[in-house]
Amino acid sequence: MEPFIGSAAVRSGALTRRGLQRKYTALYRDVYIHRDLAVTARIRAEAAWLATRAPLAGTSAAAVLGTLWLNPDLPAEIIRADRHAPPRIVAHSWTLAPGETCMVAGMDATTPARTAFDLGRLHRADVAVPLVDALLNATGIKPADVLAVAEAHPGARGVARLRALLPMVDGGAESPQESRLRLVLVRAGLPAPQTQIEFRDLRIRVDMGWWEWRVAVEYDGVQHWADRRQRSWDIDRIALLEEAGWAVVRVSAEMLSRPHVVVERVRAKLRMAGCPV
């Protein structure tokens, strides 16, 4: 059940006041959800819109636009000139240009490009890149769309940071870990890898890599180690790639805590393939 206005539900007879208090919990004043409903970033955003009727922004806009992997515990974000907002909602007094808001399921929110602009300029790269990657993945916008918003707001806080960030984003990432892995490689001076490389004849896709040098990099999450069928398929898949002349570097979550090891392994494979790194 989606968030709803408690007093309206009682007035309509859909709920009694006692039923409202027993089975539902308030996220914001007079905005309720069922006690058994897990609070996601989207649920929090929907509740914030009901509580304020103000345009959603930042991670809240990203949530209603379909972005995955968002932290559900972050405060909701809205845009309001007077910056007045209930507790646990952050209000921004940003000036929006015409065309920088859209309607999503009946709610006002910043457009995908404007949302990416705000996420990219206000967060450090290791936070912003996974967020913007996920937003691009969900909406299909391109870095050029975000750059166009930046050009319309040359004096906005964090624009220089955003411009430096955009060459590092890629909507092909299918998890925050893939985004962080790619960021580690690019920050180390390696050429930006292509994401989601498909081998149609082999029916295989790899997370990222370089066609020119036939080097692939795979992020292996927990399921790659815990699931027997997945592990067996991974072994077969790597063998097929190697038979096709590709070198594959596999990276685990633990290895991401040792980025220098990841970088040197990938660099070594690229050098062996003739890449001048």
Named regions from a protein language model:
Residues 1-159, 194, 271-277:
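Short gly/ser-rich loop at a beta-strand->alpha-helix junction or flexible surface loop bordering the NTP-binding
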Residues 8-10, 136-277:
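Surface segments flanking catalytic/ligand-binding clefts of nucleic-acid enzymes
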